[in-house]
Amino acid sequence: MSTIGVVLDEDRLRSMADDLGKVPGVRAVALGGSRARGTHRPDSDIDLGLYVEADVDLTALAEAASGWTGEDVEIAGRGGWGPWVDSGAWLIVDGAPVDLILRDVTRVEDQCARAARGEFAFHSQPGHPLGFLDVAYAGEVATGVPLCDPDGILVALAQSMTPYPDALRAAFIENLWQVDFLLNAATKGAKTGDAAYVALCGTTAAMLIAHAWHVAAGQWVTNEKGLVPNVARLPIDTAGFSAAAAAVLGSIGTAPEELLASIAQLRGLPRPATPSD
């Protein structure tokens, strides 16, 4: 059965969130991802973020989800999806694709505090080629839509992250030094025709610049998917960054001279101003 275009209305989502909120250890539930931000496609999954204590009752969670699907559901244990995406389940509910994504509420609070201090890091995580951005947890609560939040945890955290923290904005802009460092390394690979290495360095450099453009606009990033093209949709002048990045990354070349030319184009990609500019 096709799930393209199948959606669940707000009443259904809130009913599901209430079911989840009754499970011991679940503190809050929110609609997340592209549907919370209003940037979804017709075939986008429905992401439900569950903010849980470490001792959440996974068996009870599975039973609640089984009540919607009519079949057995397995909830991955902590770390089952990797150290940062953590755990959850993929479901089909009333014909719609639903992702249950568990977030340890203590870790989320910690990352909100780090974001406020201007600290961030990328971590190795399956499915995240750039790495999982730890303060994406803060971005999720800032952009999510609370569906069940009896203690006001999500509302309080979102307020603490709104507007975008100045310290975090400055940290991402200052991190642009890595772009030239990466491209200098790519130059060495280009001389030997190592297209894969050049492409990896170039893509990483473009994504770091794209992150900086988003923070310059005060916009949270929670996933590197769509990161580069979405710069063109920011409410600030980004000087054609997205189109320029797509052009060079789409034809980076294979011969040394082609790779070196692509690196030169990557160096010239528009960047947001740094404090020293």
Give the ranges of each region predicted by the language model:
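Short low-complexity stretches enriched in small and charged residues
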Residues: M1-D11, D47-A60, M161-A167
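Helical scaffold of the NTase/Pol beta-like nucleotidyltransferase catalytic core
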Residues: M1-L31
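Conserved NTP/Mg2+-binding pocket subregion across the NTase superfamily
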Residues: S2-G5, T69-A190
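Hydrophobic, Leu/Ile/Phe/Ala-enriched alpha-helical segments that form helix-helix packing faces
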Residues: L20, A65-V73, P270
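Short N-terminal helix-initiation segments at or just after the protein's N-terminus
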Residues: A30-S44, T143-G152
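Catalytic metal-binding acidic patch
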Residues: G33-W68, S87-R103
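Conserved nucleotidyltransferase catalytic core and NTase-mimicking acidic/glycine-rich helix/loop elements
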Residues: P146-D277
